[in-house]
């Protein structure tokens, strides 16, 4: 189960979900910078402990406006700051375990005090794996170098995975003498399954709006360029500035939508997800599953069956 910071905190929801003894728990993603590395480390340590090692710590930078204006925290430079954050977390984990004293002197985080009474002490499971959300080449390469896994952005296509994600992860991993195959690759999908064409189209339209929403971000324009659709972000932003929400979605025509969205009946979606992500993703996240549950509390079981069917035909690559 992949749980985001959105309205409610990812960590408290992960703690509640830990009561389900057979599911893995991922914060996917939690916003890093507004929380001190010590705060994040303490929460992750406890979640790893209470879940018997089923928790993975997923972190992201968010964007400048949210970090500075919503959280009142520092943002720049996000890439190096995230690298330093991960280094601080690993130093704290080692101090909790008692293998090293806390003495971390990073570019942005300096930590040197952990009295015994304030340390949670060792736990009987490994340190929580640290996964980073990454989009651009620098962040992907850095994640390949320092992280245990990568959260791919929901605005992903096979071309983006092949041309951007995998090559940069390989470059980063090679710097530290490991293979990119050692990394967990967590890929969200705008899967749009349904038992009727109306149900499928409902999720397709939701996906269309999400592609337009994410596609309005200038930093993601290159993903459309890779598809031979230059100028897509500019057209979406023009509609956005005019307050034309329907117009934003209309920029994403059906052919473009199909690059991001896998739709069909439930069985077809399983096959198509498997074909797209087999030998690439170690975990596929069904982006709309939580939304389906929020609308209809009986719907989650059907999405769970889809996930189990996908796992059966596409065993984890890692």
Regions found by a protein language model. Give the residues of each.
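Active-site-adjacent structural elements that line small-molecule/cofactor binding pockets in enzymes
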Residues: 4-318
